[in-house]
UniProtKB/Swiss-Prot annotation:
The keyword Protein biosynthesis applies. GO terms for cellular component: aminoacyl-tRNA synthetase multienzyme complex; cytoplasm. Consists of three domains: the N-terminal catalytic domain, the anticodon-binding domain and the C-terminal extension. This is Proline--tRNA ligase. InterPro entries: aa-tRNA-synt_IIb, aa-tRNA-synth_II, aa-tRNA-synth_II/BPL/LPL, Anticodon-bd, Anticodon-bd_dom_sf, Pro-tRNA-ligase_IIa_arc-type, Pro-tRNA_ligase_II_C, Pro-tRNA_synth_II. It catalyses: tRNA(Pro) + L-proline + ATP = L-prolyl-tRNA(Pro) + AMP + diphosphate. Keywords: Aminoacyl-tRNA synthetase, ATP-binding, Cytoplasm, Ligase, Nucleotide-binding, Protein biosynthesis.
Amino acid sequence: MNQPAIKHALNVKRADDFAQWYQAVIAEAELAEESGVRGCMVIKPWGYGIWERIQKLMDAEIKEAGVENCYFPLFIPLSYFTKEAEHVEGFAKEMAVVTHHRLISDGKGGLTPDPEAKLEEPLVVRPTSETVIGAAMSRWIQSWRDLPLLTNQWANVVRWEMRTRMFLRTSEFLWQEGHTAHVDEADAMKETLRALEMYRAFAEGPLAMPVIAGPKPENERFPGAVETFSIEAMMQDGKALQAGTSHYLGTTFAKAAGIQYQNKEGQQALAHTTSWGVSTRLIGGVIMTHGDDDGLRVPPQVAPQQIVILPMLRDNEGDDALLAYCEEIRASLVKLSVFGERIRVLLDKRPGKATQKRWAWVKKGMPLILEIGGRDAEGGLVSVLRRDRLWRQDAKPNFVGQAKDDFLASAATELESIQAALYDEARARRDAQIVRDVTDLEGLKGYFAEGNKYPGWVEMGWAKPTGEALDKVVEQLKALKLTIRNTPMDAEKPVGACPFTGEPAVEKILIARSY
């Protein structure tokens, strides 16, 4: 007997067109929308609520490490960038620049920059803050006693992207950027790796998004960095998403900004600096890691609300008793804790059919949905729908009827179960798509051939070439639309030769298509 077909909430499926599906999830889940400025988005309440959860949880981790929050100017003098040649070259094509401070009428009903109001020095709209924070550090640091100096800021940045996609690559985005200064390389590298581990644990914990951490190859380093480390997540189409980076900057920026200190021997020395950051790109990662053909599925730890209660109102005299019952359940739930916090519950009393509101919340990815009718209220019952177990075999929503008290006793456990299930599902999918039996360039070409619609990642041996030899490999990979993501820190030692150079492999690398 054939199983009945499921009628999914979205009109486009992941398997048919992943890019269109991604845009559909953003629209239907009401996460964000395009604005009147190319490449800039309006983040709607549900999308911003996820970012606020990320902020709250990560800010606590940052402060636990002794890092203090600051705020630095949005506008940075152009001369700050010209002090560090490699850094300015890396960002030059993306910089937005302010040249005037006043507008005047153009005589045609419009406005134009006032020629008399040209700035003496152009101001760059913050693409990242190493230069301006370095200038502040040079004033704050005098002695070894001032180190380490650990700062962070939550801010917006602007990088004028040519090809934009909401949450993944926008001209303006929100992020946190940590900037620290240290007495020597060892202490700075310790901080670089601490931040990397914080990001790894955060991705795999609250975001339920498995990642692989490791150093980037020389050609993929942050402009001006000595070493760049990343966490890489696999999306459901097999592409890699760089979800966070941590950089050891050596004395490069200290030299440019004059960050010096008097060491214990009374001599002047340059500080060693780091920077590290994650952005609203994490929300794009959550969408493409956990979304399905019915919309978004939000891990409970970062969901703005974890449970929604939908009373099935009839516009009759029984509604008051039903609402009172629903409020009683809400009041009981918010006294309970999960993941070290109170459970977040919304009683949705908006007018409209409960079924319509149910599908709106399904598309938003609400972890638990309760539907409660008049008979449920009379019998002390609830109907519970887990977003990660949406469908029954008969293609109907997988509601489970429970006694109210039983649900209250199990609500926290259910949320923990959803969090774990989302991670386990994503981890199993990723692990199944990391290929380790490709050993030469022809095999690489074959794996990423057009017939393989959603290939995963290839892990290969690597001789760690530099200079022209590395450039040659980068061009070979570019022709296949591939990049080296990173060197997995927990990978086994390679055996045999590097497929690109023929020399003995000294480490392993991940090769993938990416966002």
